[in-house]
Amino acid sequence: MKNRKIYLMGACLLCGLTSIAQNVSLQPPQQLNEQGKTLSLPAIYRIEGEKEANPHAVKALQGILTGKQSTKEGIRIYIGEKGDKSVRKYNKLIPKHEEGYYLAVNDKEIILAGNDERGTYYAIQTFAQLLKEGKLPEVEIKDYPSVRYRGVVEGFYGTPWSHQARLRQLKFYGENKMNTYIYGPKDDPYHSAPNWRLPYPEKEAAQLQELVKVANENEVDFVWAIHPGQDIKWNQEDRDLLLSKFEKMYQLGVRSFAVFFDDISGEGTNPQKQAELLNYIDEAFVKAKPDVTPLIMCPTEYNKSWSNPKGNYLTTLGEKLNPSVQIMWTGDRVISDITRDGISWINERIKRPAYIWWNFPVSDYVRDHLLLGPVYGNDTTIAKEMSGFVTNPMEHAEASKIAIYSVASYAWNPTKYDTWKTWKDAIRTILPGAADELECFAMHNSDLGPNGHGYRREESMNIQPVAKRFLSSYVESGKYEKVDFDLLWDTFEQMKEAGDILLVNTENEPLIVEITPWLHQFNLLAETGEEVLKMVKNDSKSFFLRRYNHVKALQQRMFYTDQNYNQNPYQPGVKTASKVIKPLIDQIFATAVKRYNQKYGADLDATTDYMPHKLISNVEQIKNLPLQIKANRILISPMNEVVKWPAGNFIEIELDNIYPAESIDINFGKKEPCTWGRFEISADGKEWKTIDLKQKDARL
């Protein structure tokens, strides 16, 4: 949320009988007592303890209060850490938990007391969140985080965040009581092989130094991660090079470090060697520097489905790794929600609480979708079973804030987490001037579509029952309830209005830039929906044909948008409202055209968009991947992770027809010789012919 400039009016506190339930958005406190009154702040105040207290907290407080500060008169505002003279008489009221704080507001004083410096900073953030139009509720809060480390891991594949986006993120984390930012973008060449051994160039080093500075100002641990596993040599030379790189990062101000061994193959996956290296780093570097936080590692087997039941990878780490080293975990699968059974399973093996790397709203495997829906699905009773909880976001930094805000609330106090209230609060925090429009857009842009991980989210829940009822009735009998028709019409109207209003919004320009292709597609889809409903309502020849031709034109425009925007090399294109709204419109259109053809003996094309070819496979990671067509290419969406292709398994692409071909070009994305399989073709699916392929780089 933005720092609110509060103009303090009047000479004394004024009391009213308004409840705290007045649209206040904050992470749910552990204990909150409200008196049912609101207080208007005076123009004069005294801050007691500002010289001893956390300077970041004092600066944040001064940024909120714009009245006149006095040394002799006005309401007293006590700020400080446990033991400071200014808050000593409140010591027994301050929670003993790390980052805990005590906050009290009444007509005599305001107390902002932390158990430690970060706790004081969080007291200020809650104070800012409680302020509403210059008024505060009269409250007493005792609060602390349920999960020790809470934040974000920039660990996705694809376009890394810009420097300015990261700076905005760090401020957002501090405002929402997140204490961790793990810097590990997969496309940073100095983070991973082969350049992890090299220092950052001057420009990049200066940017990292600025990020560390801003992180510190917002009470966020900037964790720099290295990803050496793909080409590391288990010798003293590479140990020294890794320590040298850490030392260079330390000189830039970094005080928190991580080592990633995820998504690799080969010798780098050896758990014994990994443990030896990490213990060496822990003892020679981390523990040798008193201001460095505990080391974090991401294992190669970072989810249950990838752990070898006959192997001992995880148990080796559990037994060999120093107890202070944190071990990351994504859950039962690469993309999954965290359950009690799942976290008990991993904790038993690694002999410590897992550090959760939650892969949502990351979209690097469904880059044609935006994931703007609510955060749900994680067990709310397992805070003590995990040492940390960080979210892996989308490459769209501003759009990711909807989920990040929600994760901040969940990790702060899971037992009081409210999915829908938090989602709505997140939207109003990010775009208060057009919150209703962003909520409409986000409601219909939350599912991932078919994907190799099989992870799906609810979408368009508010209209889903109506859509199902209308479609069932119309397809079966050509009839429908007017109330359902009107509700669908209103939905398409709201979608169009939301898209137009958001496209011209200047309140959060980085957000609008990120989502603009999807907004255009959203508008086109909504307009298509209205035209299709007109076809349902009136099937007279001239009217129907005008609507039909318009729908066909809109389909072409949507195809153009999909083919020309967001053209990343993995899942290019722009998909919107794909789970409920678009299938609904397509099926209504197809049914309306079919009925028209039957009535008039016509032969209008009822095609919407479709995939004529079919993927068949028994390779677990591949069988659910969507196919794409680009010119004369058929693409299987690439996997970010190492694909495990057992002997005897296959991938089959079944074409819609028999095509003459002079050549075939296959790209597996790997330069290693393809000696592990063969290529076969068949015209009837019964008789197969083996074709010899020549290899050039990654192509066959």
PLM feature spans:
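Substrate-binding groove of N-acetylhexosamine-processing glycoside hydrolases
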Residues: 25-27, 33, 280-308, 313-617
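Acidic, His- and aromatic-enriched active-site or binding-groove loops in soluble protein domains
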Residues: 203-208, 245-254, 315-333
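Feature activates predominantly on carbohydrate-active enzymes
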Residues: 95-241, 245, 251-255, 287
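Disordered, acidic Ser/Thr/Pro-rich linker "stalks" and the adjacent N-terminal cap
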Residues: 557, 581-677, 681-685, 694-697
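Active-site-proximal loop/turn and secondary-structure-junction residues that shape catalytic pockets
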Residues: 158, 169, 187-189, 226-230, ...
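Active-site groove signature of glycoside hydrolases
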Residues: 245-271, 293-302
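Acidic, contiguous N-terminal accessory segments
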Residues: 21-107, 134-141
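Bacterial Sec-dependent N-terminal signal peptides
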Residues: 1-24
